Amino acid sequence: MEKVRLTAFVHGHVQGVGFRWWTTSQARELKLAGSASNLSDGRVCVVAEGPQTQCEELLRRLKENPSSYRRPGHVDTVIEQWGEPRDVEGFVER
């Protein structure tokens, strides 16, 4: 199974509502590595590495409206970028 790197910039009301914690929980459930970080402009940057199907599932959960996974906050838009994995380990909230 091919590994990929997903970088997702999540726009909306996603800071101060438990969004990074929720994202970390979802990524760990999907056995992905990476991080979820607040950006100074109010977005959250999610970086995930692992099998493409698992990264696509995380992206689907990030975008889904309304969320069937009890995602906190409100997501307006998710901008995604795909690339080569950098072999990070674990998933952390920054």
Swiss-Prot record:
Signal peptide: none annotated. PROSITE patterns: ACYLPHOSPHATASE_1, ACYLPHOSPHATASE_3. This is Acylphosphatase. Pfam families: Acylphosphatase (PF00708). The gene is acyP. Keywords: Hydrolase. It comes from Corynebacterium glutamicum (strain ATCC 13032 / DSM 20300 / JCM 1318 / BCRC 11384 / CCUG 27702 / LMG 3730 / NBRC 12168 / NCIMB 10025 / NRRL B-2784 / 534). Disulfide bonds: none annotated. Belongs to the acylphosphatase family.
